[in-house]
């Protein structure tokens, strides 16, 4: 079960323990704590990462697992998508000691039973407001992906359909079924 606490400052967030297995994010100053992902969640994230990593060979993007993105200082927002895609120039411009600033071009979240709809929706809104071109929300039980884009539009892709990244790069497609193949 996700735990949402009261308001937290950026300085207090940076002082939280690391390496204890808990997943922490801050959305508009509210700390969200989730238990570590279970194997199905991790496997789907791994498949998404592996499939998208083929785009790195084209030199256009970098693909990350659980990278941290600092969206704002006040109120603090820091999000760690399961998988994210950044344009190569943004990835290269970030020092190895810093968080990425702003949202990734594509953020991918695998829904966990412990994640509340409220927290998930706030995270999607924050990512889009921070500049994401799309947020893919993967629903393992339904075997579908909900795609959110700026302007309040969303649509669903199911097995037998394709996911696309028009801006990253044009012409690339991913069969939804590849995220769920055993």
Identify what each model region corresponds to.
Residues 1-182:
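Gly/Pro/Ser/Thr-rich low-complexity, intrinsically disordered segments predominantly at protein N-termini
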